[in-house]
A protein has these predicted regions:
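Short Asp/Glu-rich motifs
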Residues: 20, 50-53, 136
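A short beta-strand-loop structural module common to alpha/beta enzyme folds
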Residues: 38-49
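A short, charged/proline- and glycine-enriched loop
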Residues: 2-8, 92
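Glycine-rich beta-alpha loop elements in corrinoid/cobalamin-binding modules
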Residues: 24, 28-32, 44-46, 73-143
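Charged, often glycine-rich, active-site loop that binds/positions anionic groups
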Residues: 48-77
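Glycine- and acidic-residue-enriched helix-capping/strand-helix junction motifs
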Residues: 16-25
């Protein structure tokens, strides 16, 4: 993964079906690279699957239905979120763009950006079809 002086890091945030990976970040990457910027994609949806394996359905439920209360799952989610933040901080892009593909991505976006803002000082852009419901677009902007 390109990390030296990276302009833009695009992130696919959980949770969306693995059988239909979102194409938005790939299309955006092509456009920003054509415009002369360096860019890479981080697929946190796939990373969640890789980190949870046979327990993936529990985490799918956690992020899509907000079914909380299992201390073990809560602790694992916290560890996973921390690992994602640490990865972004290590990459240290000038801009992080988070693709909120569906409204099922909103909880992961809120949890991730809350932690990310504590350690990452670059620009953060949130966009996608899933931000238009329940006020996530206005709740997490900084203008």
């Amino acid at each position: 993964m390109l990390t030296d002086n990276l302009d833009i890091l695009l992130i696919n945030i959980p949770i969306s079906g693995l059988q239909y990976p979102p194409a938005g970040t790939s299309q955006l990457k092509g456009s920003v690279v054509d415009a002369g910027f360096t860019c890479t994609i981080l697929d946190l949806n796939l990373d969640l699957f890789n980190k949870t394996g046979s327990d993936y359905s529990k985490f799918f439920d956690y992020f899509s239905e907000a079914t909380h209360g299992d201390p073990e799952i809560d602790a694992r989610v916290d560890q996973i979120l921390d690992s994602w933040v640490d990865n972004v901080v290590k990459i240290n892009p000038r801009v992080v763009g988070i693709s909120v593909f569906t409204m099922m991505c909103q909880l992961a976006t809120r949890l991730f950006t809350k932690k990310l803002k504590q350690k990452y000082t670059g620009k953060l852009v949130i966009g996608g079809a899933g931000i238009s419901t329940n006020g996530i677009a206005s709740a997490y902007n900084d203008f």
